[in-house]
């Protein structure tokens, strides 16, 4: 049963990121086909910003509700339904016939993803109460998130190459539609194994005894939890800001490089997919590094700074220099940027269950992850695109790369400064 638990959590984490990271890959061709919107035009910028930010707002609001429901209805039930929601939404998006329809389905996908992370982390943390085992399980199952990123890069590259051999959708063989359809995969095994998944024993016991307290958003801001809530929310935003404000703009930056801009569109898509895959390999390495170090380093502040200190120096440089002029060097740089940034996502999955009590765990995690990460953090994508309009540079891609460098410096420096206020968990065991 423990392997089944870890398998479901790993599947959920993998396709959580899979569904999110397909957007930067599918967006340019989807906007072109559904709305006749060309890359580099003001209309493209408007729809790109809408596709990034509107789902983030919806995911943040409904994800917060999902965290509350995780505390009220149980971890397993909310986890399963959140995975089914994002899987079927992504599959339906493959058949979108207009940009508003695609936007609506991206919103429901984002809601499922936002709820899944919170429910899965609380569920796993409570199923494995031994501190060292819990750290390893959370660390290594979350590493599958980066496997999801690798999968979507690989799948998109394959579909861009071999899509013509697949059945046509609306009379065409578009890689972006097939990529969205592949998001259905996690729903299939989950429907079969759902009855065999256990509920969190601690939550179930409290519920049966009638001693489970009612969760409350207001409680997050009482003196006992106020500092934890504010600092973790802002730091989660910084972690997501680095990913969405810089790294996830690569599909728009890479086609502007001298070695790429002269290639036919299918070959450009293959190069973009390759660069994304290198970045995800870096992220996977970072998640495994975090999983190993989480057991070895006692201080949570010290653990996080292992990734923040080099990141504040290196990540802005990657976007300021290689991203504007050298594809080969960019691949090396983006591997490091992915490692340092994505490792921080796993950190929060390990840290947050240790600072909130059982009745408030889902709500507290959800506030940091969804208000901080999904709403504030992902809005860095919008900040970057707006800043790009004021940047120097001969092409839109170069201006976007410089803006990404500036945003990366801002969020990394802010996160490092905030780490000095991050509360250390009082003990190894989860608070009751």
What would you call each of these model-derived segments?
Residues 1-432:
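Transmembrane-helix signature of 12-pass secondary carriers
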